[in-house]
């Protein structure tokens, strides 16, 4: 089963507005998705750029998004320091930050993939986990996934 991931900020395959990039406010865009399959216990989100010169660059990692959530607001006010057990956990991006870091390609047009996963469990990872740790922990627990891709150039 697939999830339909959308944004009010940009259309799949189109340009991401500068507001969400390093040359703008560098805030996260609003995201929304449809109902997950039965049994979903949480969601995870990975945002990355496969066109980065040194290999895929990770811009945002979120996990343990509560199962009842169907959207993330623009400029989501979360950091990696979670004390609420019901809070969304933020992983570490390629800049070493536990936050959203928007598109900032050195040159040319890059593609930015927002990948959402519906999981049959909540994950035992701590805030600050990497994309690689998250992917390993999600193995065997993905019920559905969806993708939204936007482009950006400076």
What are these regions (language model features)?
Residues 1-154:
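N-terminus-centered regions that define maturation/targeting leaders and the start
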